[in-house]
């Protein structure tokens, strides 16, 4: 599907200011002192995540985001090769391997071919879940991996043998985040994300993949979801988005330049892959694959392309994003200095 994200930009009308006229009377009486005219207040941009911020309301530098409509193993390889220049040494691939028989996860043959042709020796990495499901324990997790066909390469459950605390620079909730301990075994990280909706996060892009997916199942995920509330799911909306971003920042800072981000916009249910076969039916059309060295740019471009869909085809996913204040992920990543929300698209199909 050819998607024109530029069409979503509103026409901005600039109002002219009319100066007040004044002067002395015929008797040359002193003119009354003029009061300084109040200038119209600049429109405030709502950054709480409940409203979409169009591109013409954003500012700052631009990053490069690559795009292909080719939803196939070859399309994935083609776009990966544009953002892999700093992927060296021992490579981890963070993706959502899904609950048993989950219908929407990234096709295993695509990942198998990518590893065989472009990242030989790479390891898929995951962590155990916070909720009590098929992947709550390491044993159950490994059984689920077999059921879902992730058997063609090593899969490292990062928190299988413990945790490690990574610093969070500039966080307002965290000074450090608890991660799966094996994260320190790897030199580079490929963030391979199935972009979709999410019950709590509004949407799940590269940020959510790392924020929840790299935090260990017992401590780190609880820090994000519950904090000090005493309730398993006590944190929501803006604060939840901000906590996710701070968790992600720990991973992004840890790998430095040796990290890259790929979002696959396919089978985009409003439900996360955590919901497995219970996921809501897909109503949003497939779009393609996006990739960047900038995590904010790739997630922002993914969101922009959903908003650019015509005839209300993105309605369900957009409603999910806005009702959960999920767009706060983007504005807080910008506030945390994690990337740019402006970008240039390089269309690999042209």
Regions found by a protein language model. Give the residues of each.
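Bacterial N-terminal signal peptides that target proteins for export
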Residues: 1-9
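N-terminal and secondary-structure boundary signal
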Residues: 21-350
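Bacterial N-terminal signal peptides
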Residues: 10-19
């Amino acid at each position: 599907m050819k998607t024109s994200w530029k069409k979503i930009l509103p026409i901005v009308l600039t109002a002219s200011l009319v100066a007040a006229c004044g002067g002395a009377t015929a008797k040359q009486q002193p003119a009354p002192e003029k009061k300084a005219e109040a200038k119209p207040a600049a429109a405030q941009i709502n950054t709480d995540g409940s409203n979409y911020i169009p591109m013409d309301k954003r500012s700052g530098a631009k990053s490069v985001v690559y795009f292909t409509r080719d939803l196939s193993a070859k399309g994935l390889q083609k776009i990966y090769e544009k953002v892999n220049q700093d992927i060296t040494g021992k490579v981890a691939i963070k993706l959502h391997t899904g609950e048993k028989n989950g219908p929407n996860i990234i096709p295993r043959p695509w990942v198998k071919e990518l590893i065989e042709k472009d990242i030989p020796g790479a390891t898929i990495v995951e962590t155990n879940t916070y909720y009590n499901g098929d992947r709550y324990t390491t044993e159950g997790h490994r059984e689920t991996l077999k059921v879902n066909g992730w058997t063609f390469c090593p899969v490292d459950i990062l928190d299988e043998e413990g945790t490690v605390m990574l610093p969070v620079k500039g966080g307002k909730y965290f000074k450090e985040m608890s991660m799966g301990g094996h994260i320190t075994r790897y030199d580079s990280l490929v963030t391979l994300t199935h972009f979709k909706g999410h019950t709590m996060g509004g949407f799940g892009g590269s940020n959510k993949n790392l924020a929840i997916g790299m935090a260990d199942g017992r401590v780190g995920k609880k820090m994000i979801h519950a904090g000090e509330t005493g309730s398993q799911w006590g944190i929501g909306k803006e604060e939840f988005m901000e906590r996710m971003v701070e968790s992600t920042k720990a991973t992004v800072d840890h790998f430095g330049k040796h990290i890259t981000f790929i979002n696959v916009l396919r089978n985009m249910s409003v439900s996360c892959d955590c919901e497995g076969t219970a996921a809501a039916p897909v109503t949003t059309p497939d779009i393609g694959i996006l990739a960047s060295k900038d995590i904010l740019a790739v997630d922002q471009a993914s969101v922009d392309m959903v908003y650019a869909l015509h005839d209300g085809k993105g309605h369900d996913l957009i409603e999910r994003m806005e009702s959960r204040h999920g767009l706060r992920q983007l504005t807080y990543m910008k506030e945390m200095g994690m990337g740019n929300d402006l970008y240039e698209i390089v269309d690999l199909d042209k």
